[in-house]
Amino acid sequence: MHKLTRRQGLVQIGTTVAAVALGASASKAATQVAAAFDQSNVKWNTLDGIEHLSYHVLDVDRDLKVVDVLLKFAANEKIILHKHHADYSTFIIQGELRLYDAKGDLTEIRPTASFVQKPGGGAPHTEGGGDEDCIAWFSNKGTDGVIYEILGPDGETLATLGLQDFEALMQAQDEPVQ
C-alpha cells in the first residue's frame, strides 16, 4: 500500500462520495475510503496488561466530561474483558469492530463507517478487530468518574480508567507528527 498525499486522499473521498450518490454500494465505498486512512500522524500507545489494543487520546474536556480517544484493535484478537460506565459514541474508521460476550461468543460486528451511540452500564464484553486491525473513535461522555472497568476472568475488577486517568495518559503521550 502506498501513502497518499492529503490532496490524493481528499480526491479519493470525493470520488467515493460521488460514486455513492450515483448508486454505488455505500459499504464498498466506505471500505475504499477507510483503506486510505493514513495513520502516520498518530502516535499509538499501549497499556500494560491490556494486550491487542493501542490508543491515542485525542482530547479530555473536564467541563463537558468528555474523553475522545482513538483505539486500534489488533486483527483477529480480543482485548481483555471490560465494562463501559460512561455513555459513548463509536465511529469505525478502518476495518470492523467485533464484539463478544463474556463467554467469548460473537454478538455484533460493526463495519467500517458505522456509528453507534450506547448508554453506559452494559454487560461485560470483549472486543477485537476483524481480518484487519480496527481503528475506532470512541467519545465517552457524561462522567468524571469511572469510564472503563477492566475485569478478570471471573468478573472481578482488576482496574478502572476514568477521566483523570485519560487526562494523565494524554499528557504523557507523544505529540502528533504534524
Task: Mark where each language-model region is.
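Conserved hydrophobic/aromatic beta-strand scaffold that supports enzyme active sites
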Residues: 55-57, 68-72, 89, 115-117
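Active-site region of the double-stranded beta-helix
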Residues: 61, 80-83, 87
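Ligand-binding loop in jelly-roll beta-barrel domains
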Residues: 120-146
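N-terminal secretory signal peptides and thylakoid transit peptides that target proteins
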Residues: 1-17
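Conserved short histidine dyad/triad with adjacent acidic residue
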Residues: 68-83, 120-122
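Glycine- and acidic-residue-biased ligand/ion/polar-headgroup-sensing regions
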Residues: 75, 84-103
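A short, N-terminal "cap"/entry segment at the start of jelly-roll beta-barrel domains
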Residues: 22, 26-65, 109, 151-178
